[in-house]
Amino acid sequence: MTDIVFSGPKSAPLTVALAHGAGAPMDSPYMDAFAEGLAARGLRCARFEFPYMAQRRDDGKKRPPNPARVLLATWRAVIDEIGRDNLVIGGKSMGGRMASMVAADLESEGTPVRGVVCLGYPFHPPGKPDKLRTEHLETLKTKTLICQ
């Protein structure tokens, strides 16, 4: 299980779990500022790292992101540990995309999260504007905020 770092009060009415993007860790200046901003507004923020980023933290070697199945399984493990009650999931770029995908899966299983927030959604791979990554968003009923 990946380590989860919490900011904000345990008694908060809402927890926002955030995953990092493909190239920067959970404690990048962007992620720190976002988590601190949520905590300052009385919300609880939970951050974690996908396995490839945790390995990079251990040995300093840059790696590509894990396959989507590993990223989605990591998200599910984090959600199971935190609990779905009053939980919004999201993240930066790739982390938000994976959150939206797992939210769609959970919704279809009848165990949805409260919402999704994507901070810079990667609508298509770099240099491939014709290859959209949005099919699951077309039917997603979970409240979703995408900030570009």
Language-model-detected regions and their locations in the chain:
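Short beta-strand immediately N-terminal to the catalytic nucleophile in serine-hydrolase-like folds
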Residues: 89-91, 119
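Serine-hydrolase catalytic machinery in alpha/beta-hydrolase-like enzymes
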Residues: 1-87
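Short beta-strand/loop motif that positions the catalytic acidic residue
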Residues: 140, 146-148
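Charged helix-capping and loop-helix junction motifs
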Residues: 129-138
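A conserved short beta-strand
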Residues: 110-123
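Gly/Ala-rich beta-loop-alpha elbow adjacent to hydrolase catalytic centers
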Residues: 91-95, 99
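Hydrolases whose catalytic domains are alpha/beta-hydrolase-1, hotdog thioesterase
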Residues: 98-102, 127
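Active-site signature of alpha/beta-hydrolase-fold catalytic machinery across serine-
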Residues: 33, 101-105
